[in-house]
Amino acid sequence: MRITLAVGLCLIACAAVASPRAKDAAKPDNPITAQTRESFRARINENVVTIMAGSASGTDLAIVQDIADVLDDGSALRVLPMVGKGPEQNIKDVLFLRGVDMGITQANILKHYAKTGELGANFIDQVAYIAKLFNEEMHILVRSDVNDIHELQDKPVNFGAEGSGTEITGRLVFEALGIEAREMHLSDADAIQKLKSGEIAASIVVTGKPAPALSNIKDARGLKLLAVPYIKELEDSYYPATLTHDDYPVLVPEGQRVDTVAVCAVLVSFNWNNDSPRYARLEKFVDRFFTNFDAFQKAPRHPKWREVNFAATLEGWHRSPLAQAWIDRAKQAMSTASRDHFDDFVAQASRTSGTPMSDSERADLFRAFLEWTKSHSNN
């Protein structure tokens, strides 16, 4: 027993001696200091911007992912897509939610908040649009025995999730058309099932075509897309649009089309002061976004990019000073290049004719030259 006790005490003593060495071995050679950690945290957050898309099923999430795929290089600029709840909430998130730099909303959101008054009269001064994006078409899925949108008067109609772009646009368009439907708020999948069973009369989907919820329908027997008339009351906020067999092979017969309306999707940000760190990050984003525009026009990017025009204006909205500055610089560069080419052209023309041109002749000729350049660049 004495031998056992001695051995036990020896093992305990060895463990006591070895323990500090084991702890020392576990320590890294170059431990991360608090200062190093803070430096890393600052560096990793320095060039990050976030963009709030709409719901996971909308076209704008694919658009935001395209932006990240093209612009995010992991260090100089990181773009983080975020899944939101739609145009109504996205405006609130851009205004109030920490960490949200930009969001996609719809151009008619101004009319919506003008009606509700929820954000006050001057909220538009706090929001700036970076770019007018693509059109989001209004789809109305009905049973095949419905032939006119006014037949939906007093009928149960699915307007999508509350606060969604579908709900907002659906309400405003129906109001303009003088139609009062019984609003339902269902998912697209549930709405299609209830439409087939006759529990509802129609389901509205507002998103860039092709809408996944509709293009994924396998059995469309008894269903069709309903036309939306483009009346005068819709001209201020909406565009005429069409849905074709190529968009929805099982819902639109070949050779036919369904006329509808579309609302514009808009990329917006908070209207930061130019001394804010957020302003500096947005400036870097805008420069890369606009400069790399051609990359968005090519496969495998979403076909809706072909509708985007960064220089387009939106009535009632304030354009981001960052976006306006980039556009102004681009116009100046184009003008300078055109002027240089034109001066060479005039010099050659003067040498040919042997007679110097007057200022008025140069002005007339320059206007003609710009028109000629524009017509040839569009070919």
Regions picked out by a protein language model, each given a short descriptive name:
Residues 107-108, 117-118, 179-277:
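Pocket-lining segment of extracytoplasmic ligand-binding domains
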Residues 46-71, 79, 136-193, 197:
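Bilobed "Venus flytrap"/periplasmic-binding protein-like clamshell domains
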Residues 10-19:
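Hydrophobic h-region of N-terminal signal peptides that target proteins for export
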